[in-house]
Amino acid sequence: TYREETEMLYQSRLSYLGQLTGNHFLDEKKLHSLAWNMGYSYAYRIEPDRRIVVNQAGMSDGVDVSQLKVGNESIKRYFQSLSDHVFSGSVDYKGTVPMGEILSTVKGGLISEYRTRNYTPREFIYRYENLSLEERASYLYLPYEEMMSEDWLSVDKVFIDEITDKKNAYEAYNIYGAGYGAMELPMGKFNVYAGLRL
């Protein structure tokens, strides 16, 4: 038995990434500074019409593959789209704080990210159970372009049946946040660094 599968598809992708950043001094002596960052990214992929054709054949009287009579066993069409959105932001503070005769450095910051994803698939198959034996014998050996033509599509002939498994589709989101604070103290020839992360 001879069997092969042919796929014809078009795939489109789009991606975008953008950022805005800033650095600011909060005083004239430039002892305190603030840095911030805002970002957005987008990714999108679509397959608007993937066509999957399965061909089969039984062995002929000879053993030469060229003698095989090949027919189309099934035709499926698959549509899918996937989109991602990511929003992010962060802010960092750094300042010099006098503690008696010691100048300590204080740092702190926050970061957050929000991500969403949406995946939508749809799957269809061409059903030919309504065809008579003679019509089916003719239909299955047509070029696949003709099998999908409107001449064959009707309620009492070939019809398109949706076989989408809804469990494969999903929507998801994720929120992430973190922060930190730290202090650096010079102690003679050494620096003492202490901090906390959340």
PLM features per residue range, with description:
Residues 1, 5-49, 73-123, 159-191:
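Outer-membrane beta-barrel transmembrane strands
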Residues 57:
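Predominantly extracellular beta-rich ligand-binding scaffolds that present long acidic/polar faces
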Residues 61-75, 120-171:
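Flexible glycine-rich, low-complexity coil/linker segments exposed to the extracellular/periplasmic environment
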Residues 138-140, 189-192:
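Intrinsic disorder/low-structure terminal segments
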Residues 196-198:
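Short, small-residue-rich loop/turn micro-motifs
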